[in-house]
Every structure is written in structure tokens, then in C-alpha cells.
Amino acid sequence: MILKISQIINGSEVAFDYVEETMDSFDLPEGIVIKGRAYEEDGHYVVEGSYRTVLKLECVRCLAEITPIIQGEFSGRFLNPKDYAKFIDSLKPEEEFGELHFEEAVANEINISELVREYVILDLSEYESCLPECKDASEVEKYSKEDIDPRWQQLLEIKI
């Protein structure tokens, strides 16, 4: 969902509640439910809300299909392009953003779906696996010995 910042001027608040059916690099069997609001505060635009989705992934241990529920909250602070340029210019070289980090509302638009996508990526476990454990552990047991996997053995023999 693209939100134009002209919709949130003069103290108005924009509420949103929608289902994003597709999202880059994710298999979403049920889409992703996104609810929240956008408002203006002290010269910048705040977008905040929550999301919930089911992802279709593979277990990193047994490669079985799993469908974890991913849910969380998101927030972002945006500046129009002119104010964002001033903000960036005000930073000294090597200076960190500080407590308030702003994103640019490119072309005076805020892409809520892209903001949520970033939060989903951050909320994903690095190694999604079956819970509480894999049903078919035969592949896991096959390579769980202390020995080196024969497929990797030749890499150890490379001379640098």
C-alpha cells in the first residue's frame, strides 16, 4: 500500500487495515494482514501498526515444509524529500542517526508494504525448523556424526 503524505497533513490521521496478497521473496499462502495508522508529528510522518502472516518455508534440518506464524509490530518515521535532504546534510561525517531515525518519503509517498517487509525479515528466525522437533530425522541423523561430511572433505584439501 502506498500512502501519499498529502493525506496525513494538518493533524489528520489515516487508519489502514488491509491484506497484502504478495510480497517480494516470500511465499504467503494467506497473505499478510497489516493494520495501523499514519499521522504527522513535529514535522515528520509516523507510520505504526501490526502485521500477521503465515509463511511457507522449509525446515533447515529436514527440509520438510513448515508454516510458521510471523507477527509483530512495526513503526517508521518519514520526512518529505526536501526535509530529508536537510536532515542528512545536518549530520556530520561518521555521525550516527541518534535516537530518531528518519526514512525518506520518496516522491512524497510512503510504501507501507515495504516497511512491513523489512520488519518480517527481521522477525524471522535465522534457522526456521520444525517445532518441537523434526518428524523424519533420518537425514539429520545421517549427517549428525562428528565426522566431516564427505561432500565437504575435498574443500579441506585445497591448498592456498
Where are the predicted features?
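A positional/architectural concept
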Residues: 1-58, 63
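Charge-rich, low-complexity linker and terminal segments
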Residues: 1-6, 77-160
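Short Cys/His-rich "knuckle" micro-motifs
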Residues: 69-72
